[in-house]
Amino acid sequence: AGLKAYDVLAGKTSFHASGYLGRSATLAELPNLRKAGLHGSIRYFDAQFDDARLALALARTAVDRGAAVANYVRAERFLYADGRACGALVRDAESGTAYEIRATAVVNATGIFVDELRALDDPGAVPLLAHSRGTHLVFAREAFGGKAALLVPKTADGRVLFVIPWQGYVVVGTTDVPVGGTALDPAPTREEVDFIVAQVNAYLEKPVRRTDALAAFAGLRPLVAGNGGSDETSKLSREHVIAVSKSGVVTVTGGKWTTYRRMAEDTIDEAARRAGLAARPSPTATLALHGKPDGTESSAESDRYAAYGTDRSKLLGLERDDPSLREPLHPNLPYTRAEAVFGVRDEMARTVDDVLARRTRALFLDVAAARAAAPGVARLLAAELGRDPAWQTRQVADFEAIASADAAPIR
């Protein structure tokens, strides 16, 4: 009944209708599914995306429409006029130069770090968030067989387990572990990895091992804390909230990717109201994001640059100008040297970690290959940014520290 309601709500935007699959049809879709006790399955259709690429598309869309976007700039304190926030003192992390940025309205949309910014504005501010760490494992597609995803609605601890084909690999997750504090690069733990392996093996004919995983990664969820102070983060709110401080700083937090536009709408409406700005229609309901295919671009799975949309032509141009850029970053990675150069020139990549984790997803697909690719990426970045060999050495060491922390629980 729930999935039929899902179909009805999707209406014309539905991919296909959900339905029941018998035992044989289920095994045809998921050949490694455990046969004992299997009677059938429910099939439904959903979408997936690359969160890093969507974040870049949103930032570049804003730039296309006149916004100023700065990378590696840290807010150190707010600026005030007559008790109202009117900007921020920020510092360029690379040069150390400080700047004052003035604004009619100030919005704090810093994800898991919103409480740190709120404390800059009001040291007595009550934290809004209870952070949760989610760990995921990545395997070769052959470990599971078939092209379908597997969703288990309720695991041993009452959570959802998923096995999802993604970018030619398979992602398995997730956990939901309460954590104190924040981290730029949270690392998975052996306990979480073993939990995921045990849970997924309960449904597999041929089990996977921890050491079969090509990569492991973790992220922090900005969950809105409940009034009861529950430490069970799976029960905390995934919805977004907006809070306004006494000085007028508008904070938006919580939420999820599927509601990002509504989050932005609510935030801008509140900021405009507080600043006394006149309301005007927003174009974002139908606004094409940067790179949206115009009908002449390839969307084939075999096209290695399909995810770049109309920017695909720039990457092909880089290859024409320098054929060596057609080479992969590593034989086991689906990314080219051209993507690293494009990341620097067009997507504000400044570090090896930027290229291998936040422009491509190499670190999250095959950690060993990403580690091996790091020195070559450092050389490409150094040539683009005018850095010396000492900088390259530091970059590789910094990336190695992150990658080794991710790799440790699966080795």
Name each region found by the language model.
Residues 1-36, 42-52, 64-65, 80, ...:
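C-terminal accessory subdomains/tails of enzymes that are appended
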Residues 44, 88-92:
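Short beta-strand segments that buttress and anchor functional surface loops
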Residues 58:
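Aromatic/hydrophobic pocket-lining residues that form π-stacking "cages" and hydrophobic walls in ligand
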Residues 62, 116-137:
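Glycine-rich beta-alpha-beta "Rossmann" dinucleotide-binding loop(s) and their flanking helix/strand
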Residues 71-86:
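A conserved short coil-to-beta-strand element within the FAD-binding core of flavoproteins
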Residues 77, 102, 160-162, 241:
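Short, surface-exposed charged micro-motifs
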Residues 84-88, 147-148:
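Short, hydrophobic/aromatic-rich segments at coil-to-beta transitions
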Residues 94-105:
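Core beta-strand elements of the Rossmann-like FAD/NAD(P) dinucleotide-binding domain
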